[in-house]
């Protein structure tokens, strides 16, 4: 099983949310550029980033000097300053950054970010609340991502019932209309697993599908 290849991320805004993203991406072995206007915050996260830089992300020249165009993903995690967050996002769009993820402060901020073309808008408290509730209600659910009101991606813990079965044995797509995107086994990740790949108890299955179909697979297939 092959590992996920390393990517390049820039995290702008090193508050509690941005700092935690920076730490986790760095822990996973990705290249991370950590950016904040506050020197104290930059120093605090310098050991959790490939590069940590003091910069004003609302200034285009400063973004360019960071080599921001070299990054596939930029996460705008600026705190309560909605104006700075919005302007930074707008500049990143103008610089053709392919994937811009932005933390929204409220509903109105969300609507503005939609208008200017943010690729993914994050509400940390709301998103985390959904994940925690899902985990509390089902012990087999390790993680949960809403794609829409109807579809989601879920990480499920393989039960003893699935041990030693292959993907083709489960036939999840035909029986339940779901797709197994990946299998995690002892830190290794197999993306787009082959029909003959074997599942072991305690493996993590990353499954995408309609929420009702995923729940049906949990209830009947696991």
Curated annotation (Swiss-Prot):
Signal sequence bounds: none
Compartments, as annotated in UniProt: Cell membrane
Cited InterPro entries: NAD(P)-bd_dom_sf, RCK_C, RCK_C_sf, RCK_N, Trk_Ktr_HKT_K-transport
Domain of life: Bacteria
Chief place of localization: membrane
Entries under Pfam families matching the protein: TrkA_C, TrkA_N
Keyword Ion transport: yes
Domain RCK C-terminal: residue ranges: 139-222
Binding of NAD(+), residues: 16, 36-38, 56-57, 78-80, 103-105, 109, 125
Loss of function: phenotype: Impaired potassium uptake.
Domain RCK N-terminal positions: 6-122
GO CC term (a single one): plasma membrane
Record GO terms (molecular function): identical protein binding; monoatomic cation transmembrane transporter activity
Topology in membrane: Peripheral membrane protein
Keywords for this protein: Cell membrane, Ion transport, Membrane, NAD, Potassium, Potassium transport, Transport
Keyword NAD set for record: yes
GO terms of biological process kind: potassium ion transport
Function: Catalytic subunit of the KtrAB potassium uptake transporter. The 2 major potassium transporter complexes KtrAB and KtrCD confer resistance to both suddenly imposed and prolonged osmotic stress.
Record-stated family: Belongs to the KtrA potassium transport family.
Description of how the protein assembles with itself and partners: Homodimer, tetramer (dimer of homodimer) and octamer (tetramer of homodimer). Part of the KtrAB complex formed by an octameric catalytic ring of KtrA and a membrane associated dimer of KtrB forming a potassium channel.
PANTHER family: KTR SYSTEM POTASSIUM UPTAKE PROTEIN C (PTHR43833:SF7), POTASSIUM CHANNEL PROTEIN 2-RELATED-RELATED (PTHR43833)
Protein name (Swiss-Prot/TrEMBL): Ktr system potassium uptake protein A
Lineage of the species this protein comes from: Bacteria, Bacillati, Bacillota, Bacilli, Bacillales
């Amino acid at each position: 099983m092959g590992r996920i290849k390393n990517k390049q991320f820039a995290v702008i805004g090193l508050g509690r949310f941005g700092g935690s993203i920076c730490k986790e991406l760095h822990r996973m072995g990705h290249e991370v550029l950590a950016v904040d206007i506050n020197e104290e915050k930059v120093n605090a996260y310098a050991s959790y980033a490939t590069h940590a830089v003091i910069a004003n992300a609302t200034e285009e020249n400063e973004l360019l000097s960071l080599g921001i165009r070299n990054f596939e993903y930029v996460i705008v995690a600026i705190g309560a300053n909605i104006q700075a967050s919005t302007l930074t996002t707008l500049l990143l769009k103008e610089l053709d950054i392919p994937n811009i993820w932005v933390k929204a402060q409220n509903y109105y901020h969300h609507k503005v970010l939609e208008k200017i073309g943010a690729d993914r808008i994050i509400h940390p408290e709301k998103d985390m609340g959904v994940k925690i509730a899902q985990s509390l209600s089902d012990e087999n659910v390790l993680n949960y991502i809403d794609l829409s009101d109807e579809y989601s991606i879920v990480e499920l813990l393989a039960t003893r019932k699935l041990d030693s079965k292959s993907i083709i044995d489960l036939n999840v797509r035909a029986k339940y209309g779901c797709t197994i995107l990946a299998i995690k086994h002892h830190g290794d990740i197999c993306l787009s697993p082959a029909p003959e790949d074997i599942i072991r108890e305690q493996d993590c299955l990353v499954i995408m599908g309609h929420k009702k179909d995923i729940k049906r697979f949990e209830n009947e297939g696991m």
